[in-house]
A protein has these predicted regions:
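Early extracytoplasmic/domain-onset interaction patches
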Residues: 22-60, 141-144
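An active-site-proximal "capping" alpha-helix that borders the catalytic cofactor pocket
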Residues: 77, 242, 336-348
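Intrinsic-disorder/low-complexity, polar/charged segments enriched in Ser/Thr/Lys/Arg/Asp/Glu/Gln
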Residues: 24-26, 38-42, 52-54, 105-107, ...
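Juxtacatalytic substrate-recognition/specificity segment
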Residues: 204-333
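Bacterial Sec-dependent N-terminal signal peptides
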Residues: 1-26
């Protein structure tokens, strides 16, 4: 018997039996014909012998941990046979359509609405949403436009995008079509497709290479206030520092940053921040943000998302590897996916000299203060596994506060046990070698693996503070590095005093008022402001209830000695007063290095 021939025949038979699972899912998106602010999507139905076939778009996507129901934004769903005749379709839930006589189906087609201009009607985080602005911009988070057939999510996807010649698609994907008005992208499965956002706009991008990684920075600024070139030097400095911090850790050869700047003069995106993907990040920020403040925000926001190349890209559980977009089982380890990532986004900045030691301590103290407002006795693993439901979902933001502090304490514990030679970054590199992007771990095995790679005391920490309800005494961990608690000076906000706001609203006129008899800061008094005055404008920009969020945002960007002109109104009379800003100073709980006997250990922690 020819064993090789028989084996080949067997493989061929298996392949034929499941041949439909190997066919390419072909999707076409037409950005040329935008009707009623909608884009048409056409999907070829894979060859099948089923009487019914389900097509779903995500209810949930990785990284958001919220139920967003993208099916709400799909209309006119049709299934057609080879002759273009409609087949019966039944909508089984908000995100799923059942195609009857599926073996006769040739294509499906539907219209997709965007989310940015209707953000008052939903809670989708803007970086996970979509924008359709004919001829100008298309923010295509692919999960908002494209779904999957049941049983075919592992098939390769071929996405063809027809677009106006003046628009260019920024993405980490490779365009396989050389024409100016059509792009073709291929991914190995649906999960890969939804991890690759694309932003179409008039070309405004830069590229640079950092240690073998190609970085793309693409910007859409509707009023041309910001360009990719204007932020690239700071982005290059930051990402170079990140790669230096990571050392020999390599996870991807290309990374794209897609920055959408929201126009506050019209209905537009309001959820500012970013959403990570393995080889890219989508970022949404207000266009009115001063350029220097935008650069600072990007340094923190993008660095967090970039560090996701460590986890979950290179280290993740089976729940993430086999993510069910409509009925997911959540992993227990958000402390790692988000907490370690957030810690790295701060640690690398002190490690690479981008911030001072005092600033690093201030940031960690701020996280302690924020975490203190959350449930400190809720086991992090339990919260993580149940993050989609109350009361656990209400604690999600703690992954960026207590989650980062957990990572810091683990880092300190490992540094202490290894006499400064190893830290949590070394642990993550070991875990990456153990698993990597293609090998997922069992949720229940991770703590044992970490313990085996480190010390028994680390296992005790994991069970007590992450799997258990015990609050962490953070000051004790700082003390291990020679850092002690103290009161430190901090610059406050001119519209807040003793944690109380100084502004209120007249509901009848929508005017912003200084609260009568409120204890104003000296700077405001020097401007002649009194309680009860109406705040009409600052530096010529008028404010009211309608744009009070912009006023609050402005106040956070105010720097010492900035020249400021206040327009106030008292008894119907307006007055302009100009002065240099003097920010209020307050003493807040913080940390400083005091034990010189531990200098070497502290240096290994922050600079090693």
């Amino acid at each position: 018997m020819n064993t090789k021939h028989t084996l080949f025949a067997l493989l061929l038979a298996i392949s034929s039996a499941s041949g439909w699972s190997q066919s390419k899912i072909q999707v076409t998106m037409d950005l040329n014909k935008v009707i009623h602010d909608q884009v048409t999507v056409t999907v070829k139905v894979p060859v099948n012998s089923a009487s019914t076939l389900l097509y779903s778009v995500p209810k949930i996507i990785p990284g958001t941990y919220s139920e967003d129901d993208y099916g709400k934004y799909i209309e006119q769903f049709k299934a057609l046979d080879a002759n273009g005749k409609p087949l019966t379709v039944t909508k089984t839930d908000v995100n799923t359509w059942q195609i009857n006589n599926a073996n006769k189906a040739k294509t499906i087609t539907y219209q997709v609405n965007d989310t940015y201009d209707i953000e008052d009607t939903h809670e989708i985080f803007s970086p996970a949403g979509s924008n359709i602005e004919a001829g100008k911009n298309f923010m295509i988070n692919t999960h908002a436009f494209i779904g999957y057939f049941e049983g075919f999510a592992q098939n390769p996807y071929e996405l063809t995008v027809l677009h106006p010649e003046q628009l260019w698609g920024a993405t980490a994907l490779t365009d396989l079509d050389a024409s100016k008005n059509k792009d073709v992208f291929v991914t190995n499965r649906y999960a890969s497709l939804v991890e690759h956002p694309i932003m179409y706009a008039q070309p405004d991008y830069t590229t640079f290479t950092v240690q073998g990684m190609e970085i793309l920075i693409a910007v859409y600024s509707p009023n041309r206030k910001v360009t990719a070139a204007s932020i690239t030097p700071e982005m290059k400095q930051m990402m170079t520092a990140q790669k230096n911090f990571l050392g020999d850790f390599n996870a991807t050869k290309k990374y794209a940053v897609l920055l959408y700047l929201s126009d506050n003069t019209k209905p537009d995106a309001e959820g500012f921040g970013a959403l990570e993907h393995p080889t890219s990040t989508t970022v949404v920020m207000p266009e009115m943000l001063p350029i220097d403040e935008l650069k600072e925000q990007l340094k923190d926001v993008v660095s967090h998302e970039f560090f996701h190349i460590v986890t979950p890209l290179s280290i993740h559980s089976k729940e993430i590897a086999n993510f069910d977009y409509n009925n997911p089982k959540m992993s227990q380890h958000l402390w790692m996916y988000e907490g370690v990532t957030e810690y790295f986004a701060n640690l690398f900045q002190i490690n690479q000299g981008l911030i001072t030691e005092a600033e690093f301590y201030k940031r960690m103290a701020g996280k302690m203060a924020n975490a203190s407002t959350m449930n400190d006795q809720m086991p992090f693993t339990k919260m993580s596994a149940n993050v989609l439901t109350k009361p656990y979902k209400d604690q999600y933001l703690n992954v960026y506060e207590k989650g980062a502090l957990i990572a810091m304490c683990l880092d300190i514990e490992i540094r202490e046990k290894s006499l400064g030679k190893r830290g949590i970054l070394d642990l993550m590199k070991q875990l990456s070698k153990e698993y990597g992007a293609e090998k997922a771990f069992d949720d229940a095995e991770l703590f044992a693996k970490i313990t085996a790679l480190t010390y028994p005391e680390i296992g005790i920490f994991l069970e007590k503070y992450i799997n258990g309800p015990t609050p962490i005494a953070y000051a004790d961990y700082f003390a291990k590095m020679g850092v002690t608690q103290t009161m430190v000076a901090s610059e406050g906000n001119i519209f807040i005093k003793e944690q109380a706001p100084l502004l209120t609203i007249n509901p009848d006129t929508k005017e912003i008022l200084f609260i009568p008899h409120a204890p104003l800061h000296p700077f405001l008094k020097n401007l002649g402001v009194e309680g009860g005055d109406v705040l009409v404008a600052i530096n010529g920009t008028k404010y009211s209830l309608d744009n009070i969020n912009e006023l609050i945002l402005w106040s956070t960007t105010l720097q010492e000695n900035d020249e400021v002109t206040f327009t106030t109104k008292r008894n119907g009379v307006e007055k302009n007063t100009t002065a240099k800003a003097v920010l209020p100073k307050e003493m807040i709980p913080g940390f400083e290095f005091t034990d010189t006997a531990k200098s070497a250990l502290k240096e290994a922690w922050l600079k090693g």
